């Protein structure tokens, strides 16, 4: 097996090898692939180094399967997982006493407040030393992973020696726990690259990985010279006159997955040649210069509407079957791609907010009921803040962030009140309505009265427990699963806090963000372009694309399709899917207009003025609303809409 394992320095990955679904001998139960930055040929062998022979019946197909297994270190991993959980619990308990920024001149007496702390740290330190010795004996060398464990017990020993200094070491404890957890995640993945698998008869030797010097040098020189002329943004190169030029506004991994699907499914079935290019940004400029594509995939934000306002894209309502395609999506998913009665983008991705919460921490501080409404969230704050904790909301980081960003608190409050940003004919805002002013005041109160932070790292705060409640995009789940294994099972998610309606029911309405596919009006064959985006947005292809991306990138790269039937077929558990669909059914959308930029700027200006300068929220939003409506009117006249 020509392979390379260059992720876990000082250790090895393990594989169990099956021949026709059977492990043929004990040596195949665990084949080790040691750390090396170079490629090596690994051949399963016995204790004396003799090759393993397998009988294969001639004339038949045979299957080789490689299964990732933990190997001998599995017991150490289980012990480490328990230790990480214990240290995290003590970290939170200490944090409740000292707060996130301990005063170095204050003696917090944490060892008295937590009497068992020093004894337990001593036991944990001993166990970490034992685990480190075990790992080094298995690997045969001192790797970075064992060094990380060593750093952890050195810190614990300092805490044991001088308990009064424990608050000083809080950050180091947190950082080392994160480092150990990260390595545990990598080990669980059992990283391994495989170039090829070679089967040889007993009278032959396996191919060496060493290449002849001249051949290697020639290849390197050729690759170097080619790098000056190669267009790395081009994924495929078709030269037919009727080729469909498609730009992809994503990374190379995603583009290669689309290329695989196009070559294996679309082109053979429809006989339409396709050129794929990676282009991140510059689409509007290229289209205005007449150098744009025929089709662009994964355009998001205000781009589809801005392109439509400039007359650069095709109205998708003209194509046969558009209603059937849209029926696969949430009923309002297309709203953000509509302009002046037309549809200028086909939804591909759709993400929306949910509320994540730490079950362990909320239970520990006596919050047994998960907040269902905004009032419930506010009622939870005293218990959180008494313990130096808080909750996190979605707030754009600058005035140029989309005002309709998924989970934007003002947008949630407006939608849950039965309002939208704009009136029916999109000629002015609704911010002058009493309920809209109430929504704005509620939003600013979170930051002025209840002292929510305007900027924070949601992942770090949720991971270390200082923010046991955060509202984030549902794809935040992927990051927690992949990058915070030490808190697996300690958290969950549910719908965003809601607003009680007049009839007593609760509205959990929220907006979403997404990306779509657009067809440019320079396209030679509109029907071919429509066939392509209809094919790509179909349930079968969206499932295939989602599986390819998750296979390449892992859980962190799990796809968020707008096609709900495709979403249901991805790797979500039934309970997780029920929660996602629960929020999905509550989604409402805020339209995009060419003057959305002025809405964005003035909403955030009003917020900063009311919160940071302590101005009256009502007066602030009413005053700036006049500027918003004046710019909307000017823009509509400029575009000939009025």
Locate each region found by the language model.
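Extracytoplasmic/periplasmic solute-binding protein
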Residues: 339-348, 353, 375-429, 435-436, ...
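Glycine-centered hinge/linker elements that transmit conformational signals in sensory
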Residues: 382, 425-455, 496
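Conserved C-terminal helix/tail region of periplasmic/extracytoplasmic solute-binding proteins
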Residues: 78-238, 581-642
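Long, aromatic- and glycine/proline-rich binding clefts that accommodate carbohydrate-like moieties
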Residues: 494-498, 547-605, 609, 640-642
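Extracytoplasmic/periplasmic substrate-recognition and gating elements
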Residues: 484-555, 588, 605
């Amino acid at each position: 097996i020509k392979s390379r394992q260059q992720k876990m320095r000082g250790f090895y990955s393990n594989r169990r090898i099956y021949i026709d679904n059977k492990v043929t001998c004990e040596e195949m139960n665990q084949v080790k692939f040691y750390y090396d930055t170079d490629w090596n040929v690994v051949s399963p062998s016995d204790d004396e180094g003799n090759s393993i022979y397998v009988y294969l019946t001639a004339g038949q197909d045979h299957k080789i399967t490689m299964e990732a297994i933990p190997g001998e270190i599995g017991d150490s991993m289980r012990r480490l997982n328990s230790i990480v959980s214990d240290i995290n619990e003590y970290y939170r308990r200490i944090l409740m006493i000292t707060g996130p920024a301990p005063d170095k001149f204050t003696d917090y007496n944490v060892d008295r407040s937590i009497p068992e702390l020093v004894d337990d740290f001593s036991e944990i330190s001993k166990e970490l030393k034992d685990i480190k010795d075990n790992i080094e004996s298995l690997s045969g060398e001192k790797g970075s992973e064992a060094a990380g464990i060593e750093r952890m017990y050195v810190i614990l020993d300092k805490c044991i020696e001088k308990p009064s200094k424990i608050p000083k070491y809080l950050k180091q404890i947190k950082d080392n726990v994160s480092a150990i957890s990260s390595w545990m995640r990598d080990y669980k993945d059992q990283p391994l690259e495989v170039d090829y698998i070679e089967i040889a008869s007993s009278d032959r030797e396996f191919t060496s990985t060493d290449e002849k010097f001249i051949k290697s040098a020639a290849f390197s020189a050729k690759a170097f010279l080619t790098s000056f002329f190669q267009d790395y943004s081009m994924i495929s190169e078709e030269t037919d006159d009727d080729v469909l030029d498609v730009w992809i506004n994503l990374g190379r991994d995603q583009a290669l997955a689309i290329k695989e699907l196009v070559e294996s499914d679309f082109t053979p079935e429809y006989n339409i040649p396709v050129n794929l290019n990676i282009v991140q940004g510059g689409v509007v400029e290229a289209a205005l210069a007449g150098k744009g594509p025929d089709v662009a995939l994964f355009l998001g934000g205000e781009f589809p509407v801005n392109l439509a306002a400039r007359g650069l894209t095709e109205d998708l309502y003209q194509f046969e079957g558009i209603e059937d395609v849209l029926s696969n999506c949430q009923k309002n998913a297309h709203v953000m791609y509509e302009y002046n009665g037309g549809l200028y983008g086909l939804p591909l991705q759709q993400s929306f907010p949910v509320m994540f919460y730490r079950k362990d921490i909320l239970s520990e501080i006596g919050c047994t009921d998960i907040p269902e409404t905004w009032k419930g969230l506010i009622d939870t704050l005293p218990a959180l803040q008494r313990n130096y904790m808080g909750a996190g909301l979605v707030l754009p980081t600058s005035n140029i962030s989309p005002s309709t960003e998924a989970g934007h608190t003002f947008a949630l409050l407006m939608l849950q009140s039965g309002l939208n940003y704009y009136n029916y004919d999109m000629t002015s805002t609704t911010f002058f309505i009493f309920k809209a002013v109430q929504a704005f005041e509620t939003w600013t109160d979170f930051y002025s009265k209840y002292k929510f932070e305007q900027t924070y790292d949601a992942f770090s705060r949720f991971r270390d427990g200082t923010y046991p409640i955060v509202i984030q995009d549902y794809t935040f789940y992927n990051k927690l699963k992949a990058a915070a294994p030490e808190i697996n099972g300690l958290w969950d998610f549910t719908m965003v806090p809601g607003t009680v309606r007049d009839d007593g029911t609760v509205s959990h309405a929220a907006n979403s963000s997404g990306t779509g596919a657009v067809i440019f009006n320079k396209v030679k064959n509109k029907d071919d372009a429509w066939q392509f985006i209809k094919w790509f947005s179909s349930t079968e292809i969206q499932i295939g694309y989602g599986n390819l991306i998750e296979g390449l990138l892992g859980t962190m790269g799990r796809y968020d399709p707008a096609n709900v039937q495709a979403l249901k077929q991805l790797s979500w558990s039934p309970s997780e899917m029920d929660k996602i669909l629960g929020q999905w059914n509550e989604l409402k959308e805020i339209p995009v207009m060419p003057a959305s930029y002025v809405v964005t700027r003035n909403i955030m200006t009003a917020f900063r003025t009311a919160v940071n300068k302590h101005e009256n929220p009502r007066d602030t939003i009413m005053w700036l609303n006049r500027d918003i409506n004046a710019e909307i009117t000017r823009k509509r006249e400029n575009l000939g809409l009025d």
